[in-house]
């Protein structure tokens, strides 16, 4: 499965890319304009067409997991270690070691992850593509990836760029004396830029906060083009107190608590140096996206001095945090807490800090005859002046082993957060311990049910008296919590019965509780007293109940079809479920169930596409699922919006037939906001009510084209079979075990 993400709009994404290349209106003669240019309200379906298999040069049958298993990872590590200390004239290594440079590369590749929508992160290696490859915060990382190209070239398809960059960061840390927590492979590469909403700012370094100072969801970085926060302070203002607030919010939205945040900053700034030999405005050229073809994808050409080595310009800040920047030491914390720091400026004019009693004790990165004072960023000083961070920093300084473990675990979390559950990890270096942020699942201590058991359980479920629509709603609620951006959620674990999911309004908690109570009774009756070692999980029963109800609805439509079912799910415990971490998965809108909370900044139709994108659905799959779920009466709150059938509970194509019926005229309801009334054109009699999500399948030209297929007289069976296929896909989205068989 390819990671699927969504843009706020295609134009927003294009605008970001254009920041490096010039105005979006500057275009070659004859270049086409997107429909959104002329009609901004046009529903953008491009997120459902991202990362299709046709874009992958390895082809649809390529299995990265199998390719990775053939990799001699120790040989790769050896090659990385050699590269670390083999300085290249075209981009010399600071202190003769590229380790700190590669740590920054890995950190910035993974550090785009954000919890609210699961987008960003190391997976896909999006740092290679616009806009990330041209963000100000990623300046000169184009050279880091070029330094790694010989290794990528050598091992080819057996290691992705995403895995190689993270592994290189690990090896860099280890080569400089730090013990990492482990490494898991499995990051498949993307082959095109993501359409991700990174902020509304019209230019890089724009403030991502609104006029009230609130950081917009789902963003995490405080300024456009930064991974986290501005190292000089908010908007370049060297205020450590305000910087601490920015750090806490930005890192928190990237899944890090205070201890993890401090460990990451202190650990990362133990190594390397910042580069600000001269003014970027006077010396540095355009980012890679704006450079000419002769630059071959490289940017930030520096015309001052040699343009590299001692003359390197990256952030504009200049100097190192310790006197030994290529070995792991406790010097960062010792220096931060042991000195009084005063504000100064770098040679490039950037705000930074130096000891009040500054002495030239730091070796130059390229000239051993020179020494420099220590330096700190405003964001470093923030860790000293903020009471909570300062307390942690002092504890870490006094207990180095505690700091080492905290940094190791935080680094592992940073670089693996978007990889999903541990079942997706590859390789021999995967830590054996389960971590709560991995959404751990228990190991089944029983045999999985077989075909005869499945048939028996279906009969028991259908004979239980549970409403079929409630079985379908519960199964959908459980499985559709999945999001393909960071592979979280889904039916496996049956977390729909646990906090916080058991209280989500979109799921109709009271109705779900009744279904679960009945299913638990069936589970107990099946499992009790068995001598054959077989057991059924509630997670399997939830999905099986929905599938049995779908089969029943298909029979009512005249089609005897079996919904594919793969047993093997297990039941998680509350102790294995981090309530705060799972809370961000709660939908504020789900067009598949005609659910939409007030306060959303985006339209119901846009959020339907967003939800479909997270479920890794295509346009036809999204379309058939909406039509089928309406026919099955599966709306939240038993709403009749969009139930365009006189036979609810029958898996028919009537939603599409009646939506496209020209004898019905649609108008906004005069009494209910967000509701439309479909009336007989001749008599004015009310036939149906619908939401904007329902009507978009008739108003959007692209969706209407698909809806017409399913509304056709010859499409009854196709509709049923396509619905079952899409339903099964959603039920199995988190079954990573099935994809490895």
Curated annotation (Swiss-Prot):
Active site: 108
Residue location of crosslink Tryptophyl-tyrosyl-methioninium (Tyr-Met) (with W-107): 228-254
Entries under InterPro entries matching the protein: Catalase_peroxidase, Haem_peroxidase, Haem_peroxidase_sf, Peroxidases_AS, Peroxidases_heam-ligand_BS
GO cellular component, one term: cytosol
Cross-link (Tryptophyl-tyrosyl-methioninium (Trp-Tyr) (with M-254)): 107-228
Catalytic activity: H2O2 + AH2 = A + 2 H2O; 2 H2O2 = O2 + 2 H2O
List of residues binding heme b: 269
Cofactor(s) required for function per UniProt: heme b
Domain of life: Bacteria
UniProt remark on cofactor binding: Binds 1 heme b (iron(II)-protoporphyrin IX) group per dimer.
GO molecular function: catalase activity; heme binding; metal ion binding
EC number of this enzyme: 1.11.1.21
Annotated keywords: Heme, Hydrogen peroxide, Iron, Metal-binding, Oxidoreductase, Peroxidase, Signal
GO biological process: cellular response to hydrogen peroxide; hydrogen peroxide catabolic process
Post-translational modification summary for this protein: Formation of the three residue Trp-Tyr-Met cross-link is important for the catalase, but not the peroxidase activity of the enzyme.
Keyword Metal-binding included in the entry's annotation: yes
Annotated site (Transition state stabilizer): 104
Residues annotated as signal peptide: 1-28
Family of the protein in this entry: Belongs to the peroxidase family. Peroxidase/catalase subfamily.
Assembly description: Homodimer or homotetramer.
Function: Bifunctional enzyme with both catalase and broad-spectrum peroxidase activity.
HAMAP family per the UniProt record, alphabetical: Catal_peroxid (MF_01961)
PANTHER family: CATALASE-PEROXIDASE, HYDROPEROXIDASE I, BIFUNCTIONAL CATALASE-PEROXIDASE
Name used for this protein in its record: Catalase-peroxidase 2
Native organism: Burkholderia vietnamiensis (strain G4 / LMG 22486) (Burkholderia cepacia (strain R1808))
Origin organism lineage: Bacteria, Pseudomonadati, Pseudomonadota, Betaproteobacteria, Burkholderiales
